[in-house]
Amino acid sequence: MLLKNASFYDDEVLKRADIRLKDSLIIEIEENLSPTNNEEVVECEDLFVLPSFIDLSVTNLEGYENLKQKAFKGGVGLLNVFNGDQSGIKNIMAIKNNQLADIATLKNKGGEILIAPSDAFLELISHYAKSYNLPLLISLENSFEALNSGALAYELGQNFVDNAFENTRLVRFMEVSRALQIPVLLDKVNSIATLKLIKAFNDLGAKLQAQTPLSHLILDESVYEDYEPRFKIAPPLRDKEGQNALKEALKNNEIAMLTSLHASKNSNAQLFEESAFGCESIEDAFSVAYTFLVQKKVISFQQLIKVMTINQAKFLKLNAGEVKENQLANLMIVDLNAQTRVSNQNSPFYGLELYGEVQRMILKGQTTFIKENACKKS
C-alpha cells in the first residue's frame, strides 16, 4: 500500500511525503515514490496520517468484534480489554475470583502486561512482574459511587467517594515500584493529590506513570445536576477546579497516557440512580481528544500523539506508535477539517460538535476501517 502526499509528524517535525507499507511494516518514507505493480495507492492530499491510538483501559460488555469496529472508528487500533478472553493486547489478570492467577503460564502463552485490580497478593504480583519483566498496570476496582465527596454530592443527595481514602492503596504500589524498580502505570488517575504522590515517589527513584480518562479532562461534575444516566462514570467526575488542575498537569507532562475508559452502558434505565455505570466514548476518541485538547490549545498535536500512542507503545515495548520506517504500520488517516456531532445518546459527549474525523484505519498494513467515500484510491 502506498500513501501519497501524506502529512505527518516525524518526532516534532511536520513532514509531507509518500509512505509505503508492506508485510505489516512501514518500509519507505520518501517524496515522489512510484507505485509498484498492483500496489494499492491511497491519496492523502489534505489529510493527516498519524499512528493509531492505543487504549489500555477498556471494558467489554458488548462483544469483541463490535467493540473493535467502534474503536477503529475512533482511531484506536490496539485495545487492552480487562474482561473477557479477547484483547488486542494480551494481558494477564493477576487476580481472578479472588485467587492469584497462574501468572507464569500466562506469561509463557504470550502475556504482554500484568494487571492488578486490587492490592491483594501485592508481594507475589510484584515479584512476578519483576521476574518476568512485565509492565504492571494498576487498575483498582471502582467503588461505584456516583459522585466525589463535596458540596454537590450533599446538595444532590447522592452516594459519594470519600476522597480522604482514595490514595491509601495506591501508595503501596508506588513504594513497590520504588523498591523493586518496576515500571508501573496507575490507571484512572483523576486527582492532583495522586499526581503529587506520583511525583514524590518518582523523585525517590520509582518508575511510575499516570493514565487519566479523557472524560475527566473535558467534563466536570456540574453535569450531574441534570441527572442524566450518560454521565454516570466510574470513577466520578471532578469539580471544575479539579478538572482545570488535571488539564494543567497534562500540559506539564505529569500525565503520561490518556484513555477513553470505554465501558458500554448495559442497562436502559432512565433514572440516574438506577442506571449502570459506563462511558461509551471510544468511537469518538480521536475527534473528542483533538477538539477539546488540541483545538482548545490545552496541548499540541504532537503531545496528543505522545499521550495517546507513543507512551503506551514504549510502556508495552511495542515496535509501534510513530510514523517511521521499520515500525508497525498501525496508522490512521484523518481529516482535521471535518466536523461531526456525537450521535450516541449513551455517550457523555452526546450532542457535542467535534472537529477531525477518522477516514481510514490501517493495522499491520491492512485496512480495517474506511469511512464511506473517504481516502480516494489512485
Curated annotation (Swiss-Prot):
Q: Name one GO biological process term.
A: pyrimidine nucleotide biosynthetic process
Keywords assigned by UniProt?
Pyrimidine biosynthesis
**Which InterPro entries does this UniProt record tie to the protein?**
Amidohydro-rel, DHOase/Allantoinase_Hydrolase, Metal-dep_hydrolase_composite, Metal_Hydrolase
Segments crossing the lipid bilayer: none
- Keyword set includes Transmembrane helix: no
GO cellular component annotations of the record: cytoplasm
Which Pfam families does this UniProt record tie to the protein?
A: Amidohydro_1 (PF01979)
| MF (Gene Ontology) | allantoinase activity
UniProt-listed PANTHER family: ALLANTOINASE
This molecule's function is given as: Non-functional DHOase.
> Which protein family is named in the record?
Belongs to the metallo-dependent hydrolases superfamily. DHOase family. PyrC' subfamily.
Name listed for the protein in its UniProt record: Probable dihydroorotase-like protein
Q: Which organism is it from?
A: Helicobacter pylori (strain J99 / ATCC 700824) (Campylobacter pylori J99)
The gene designation is pyrC'
